[in-house]
């Protein structure tokens, strides 16, 4: 990539229909894990006008008793879907439950790996990526980091009553200008937020007071002032946005995988996270790859780092562990790959133990990004191996 360029990432709010589905799926995973942390869960959710459908596979101890319908309603309530005017109301919506158990054919390979019978095998084949860079203190790419913060603030101001005309659904997009390969300024901010009907002058034009409130109360308090140089603001650029959430679009678990990760700054293996227990390497190995990449950057061994891992179903050991630093590493990438394999156990059991993943910690991950957040449950954000890696690299 050229040294001077524009790069864009987007995020969506907790009230976006796909994120509603993600949060319900992870709330159900957490509820099952509270009673059986070794359960196998693949919880999928569909949301539409007045309807939630819960499907997938859950295998747990016989004594596990989870009120799936109530969890779906509680999640809708927390997000803010508490009024029939919004197209879905936690009190009156229909909730269908259609769970099966995990296939025995899959379970036999996960329970005992073909290459190591003392370890569990990967729950599926696939490839996963982790990434870190020095653009922000959180070691995340700046565009996705700030896109998340915008919709997070939209929800905060909606819920605390400071901007009472806001409704749950919203999307943000940040276009960053890079100079010499580093963030220089923000070229464009797009923020589209659902609102009460009185905020538009015409179907195609928002009130000036609405636009001013969004810019002054949501956008400017979040973005670094030094980056707001001739920045263009596009606020509800199509105009009226009253119909939103599951009424505006059908929501499905796993449809916001780039929002969930790095905003397009690195490749994605294609597997979604929400609703999946950590025996599914789609989730756990992606978390581990972030942990590895972040520790490499925190150690000062590279300014940016991309990790690829790949697995075969029923096999514990990864097919490959590959490090790319795009020329920013202080030692060759192949030496970094060797260090990673020496100091990180990337077998499924190793990941679960290393990151303490058999806990009900997942609902919080399902909105505003799985990475780059300072939450005590997010063990994959620790940089506790940075000093070890630096010493092992000879620094």
Swiss-Prot record:
GO cellular component: cytoplasm
EC code: 2.5.1.6
Binding site for K(+): 44
Chain residues that bind L-methionine: 57, 102, 249, 280
InterPro entries documented for this protein: ADOMET_SYNTHASE_CS (IPR022631), S-AdoMet_synt_C (IPR022630), S-AdoMet_synt_central (IPR022629), S-AdoMet_synt_N (IPR022628), S-AdoMet_synthetase (IPR002133), S-AdoMet_synthetase_sfam (IPR022636)
Top-level taxonomic group: Bacteria
Cofactor(s) essential for the protein: Mg(2+); K(+)
UniProt binding sites for Mg(2+): 18
Similarity field: Belongs to the AdoMet synthase family.
Protein name per UniProt: S-adenosylmethionine synthase
Species annotation: Polaromonas naphthalenivorans (strain CJ2)
Upper taxonomic lineage: Bacteria, Pseudomonadati, Pseudomonadota, Betaproteobacteria, Burkholderiales
